Swiss-Prot record:
UniProt source species: Prochlorococcus marinus (strain MIT 9215)
EC numbers: 4.2.1.33
Designated gene of the protein: leuC
Name of this protein: 3-isopropylmalate dehydratase large subunit
4Fe-4S recorded as keyword: yes
HAMAP family: LeuC_type1
Length: 468
């Protein structure tokens, strides 16, 4: 009787050969590219007079460096314009599908691929971006890769990798009202640590995971990398299949029937052997906020920032650095911390369901006069849906700026940046020093609903106080 995990099954199906040194050559079913990590890779192909091996398995969009305030071409930022022109040319030269600005399908690569039905169970997916793990929400095995591996996939459709161990993270019960997938994944990272996943793939399972929507599952898998894991995934189910059905690039007619039959066979065996199993009680998770300079430094909304004596020797060093950088004191409550900027967006929380939840909090309320708040839809499709539902108007009426799709302030590789020592309440995925554009800017990670609550009060707040 088979005892394989989904990871084992997908890995074995895509294994081309075993390589000297213990790594495997893995075929990549879908390669996603964008404007930042692809130019050098295409340049390397040109130097060797090579063409893209499987252009039909390669899909491009622009997201990282595009401005969100004004997307009229040419961009004011000459570098941004140059990078997008380069991607346009490379896609044209190699016959690669390119979802450009104005296509109706441009956006953050990890938002666009699922909403188009490109992301499917049983796939291997690679992209020159660490948050490629997002796609594991569909039962695919998805890896972020560096530019040299982007080159390899373009040239051969394969990468060399060591097979990962698999840790199952079992989440019992269900999340309480006012607690979201973002809170759960921040809680998981805090419990296990930011390095616990090194060498692992994370399988998220249990009643709490089953209860999540597909977009919430994407949030969970998106931040696997923040826990040190190379990828994260969830076994596909009826929610997965329903989400994909009738999407632009999903299989149709008899191809759908054939795909569905195969997808339903793709799940970890009941008696799968895992390298490690961790069990958590999701009903105990509360709205969660980061206080430090790693995503693992988080606490519940009513908790105090940890005392040094309560931390392990390794955690103490990072905590001291975080106290100083964030201007927090041990024992201080995170609640009521003043914020200057509120950002809703990113590949973690820039989908339509994220905007809906935040809009419910903001409806008939106003952003604090001391706060600059802006929302960046994850894609043109998300923006269109939001406008059709009147969500954009709720944001505008509250005082949020409504922006165009892009990565925006998640990584500030564009014009959206913190200034000086500003404190940001952000729905993104990383709170490293300088992550949001200012060398001294400070980031507090939280759910979109919590960002909305912070925007209204001008300080870190418990969103449950806004929910009837």
């Amino acid at each position: 009787m088979s005892q394989d995990t989904l990871f084992d099954k997908v890995w074995d199906l895509h294994k081309v050969s075993s390589l000297p040194g213990g790594s495997d050559q893995i075929f990549i079913g879908l390669h996603l590219i964008h404007e930042v990590t692809s130019p050098q890779a295409f340049g390397a192909l040109k130097d060797k007079n090579l063409k893209v091996k499987f252009p039909e398995r390669t899909v491009a969009t622009v997201d990282h460096i595009v401005p969100t305030d004004n997307q009229s071409r040419p961009f004011k930022d000459n570098l941004a314009e140059q990078m997008i022109e380069t991607l346009e040319k490379n896609c044209l030269d190699h016959n690669i599908r390119f979802f450009n600005i104005g296509s109706g399908n441009q956006g953050i690569v990890h938002v666009v691929a699922p909403e188009l039905g490109l992301t499917q169970p049983g796939m291997t997916i690679a992209c020159g971006d660490s948050h490629t793990s997002t796609h594991g929400a569909f039962g695919s095995i998805a890896f972020g890769i560096g530019t040299s591996q982007v080159r390899d996939v373009l040239a051969s459709q394969t990468i060399a990798m060591n097979k990962l161990k698999v840790r199952q993270i079992w989440c019992d019960n269900k999340l309480s009202k006012g607690v979201y997938a973002k809170d759960l994944v921040l809680h998981i990272i805090n419990e296990l640590g930011v390095k616990a996943g090194v060498g692992f793939a994370y399988e998220f399972a249990g009643p709490a995971i089953d209860d999540l929507s597909m977009e919430e599952r994407m949030t969970i898998c998106n931040m696997s990398i923040e826990g040190g894991a190379r990828c994260g995934y969830i076994n596909p189910d009826e929610k997965t299949f329903s989400y994909i059905k009738n999407k632009l690039c999903a299989p149709k007619n008899e191809h759908w029937d054939k795909a569905l039959k195969w997808w339903k066979s793709l799940k970890s065996d009941e008696n799968s052997i895992y390298d490690d199993v961790v069990k958590l009680n999701a009903s105990e998770v509360e709205p969660t906020v980061t206080w430090g300079i790693t995503p693992g430094q988080s606490i519940s909304i009513n908790q105090q920032i940890p005392l040094l004596d309560d931390l392990s020797p390794n955690d103490k060093l990072v905590a001291k650095e975080a106290y100083e950088y964030m201007s927090f004191k041990p024992g201080q409550l995170i609640k009521d911390t003043p914020v200057d900027v509120c950002f809703i967006g990113s590949c973690t929380n820039g989908r339509i369901s994220d905007l809906r939840v935040a809009a419910q909090v903001l409806k008939d309320k106003k952003v604090s006069k001391n706060v600059k708040a802006f929302v960046v839809p994850g894609s043109e499709k998300v923006a269109t849906e939001a406008k059709q539902e009147g969500i954009d108007q709720i944001f505008k009426d509250s005082g949020f700026q409504w922006r165009e799709p892009g990565c925006s302030m998640c990584l500030a590789m564009n014009s959206d940046k913190l200034i000086g020592n500003q404190v940001s309440a952000s729905s993104s995925n990383r709170n490293f020093k300088g992550r949001q554009g200012s060398p001294s800017g400070r980031t507090l990670l939280m759910s979109p609903a919590m960002v909305a609550a912070a925007a209204i009060n001008g300080k870190v707040s418990d969103v449950r106080e806004f929910i009837n």
